[in-house]
């Protein structure tokens, strides 16, 4: 594999309004850029663009996905973990015992997933039927709702 020289690599640039683009091609007067939110490509004058140092073009590309959904995607590693989060969104607060009785997760796996979800801000501790449990946060609910309407 041959790496492109730094000047030919995709980079993040922004215009005067702060809108970020992926720089695809650059000539002496204009640059071909892509808006990561829309996928639309256009030529802009070089004097309208400024390089954004320290931001990976992959991070810029990921910005096309809303923050709640990105957070959900990074915290759920497989269908089981996604399913657990969807169930918490749909069922509301559930005690740890309810979760263990309802699903095919051992206690260690369940607590591991819930710890990851808590760290990501997707679940919070709650009480269900007088017992310690968990509930989905508004962030998780928005992300799941968005995925449901987009699919």
Locations of regions flagged by a protein language model:
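Short acidic, hydrophobic short linear motifs in intrinsically disordered regions
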Residues: 84, 92-103
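Short helix-coil-helix linker/hinge
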Residues: 74-82, 90-93, 109, 137
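DNA-contacting interfaces and partner/effector-binding or oligomerization modules
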Residues: 1-65
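A short, conserved structural fragment
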Residues: 118-128
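Short, cationic-aromatic polyanion-contact patches
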Residues: 72-79, 128-150
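Short amphipathic alpha-helical interaction segments
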Residues: 104-119
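Short alpha-helical segments that sit at the start of domains
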Residues: 58-82, 112
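DNA-binding alpha-helical recognition surfaces that contact promoter or target DNA
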Residues: 86, 112, 142
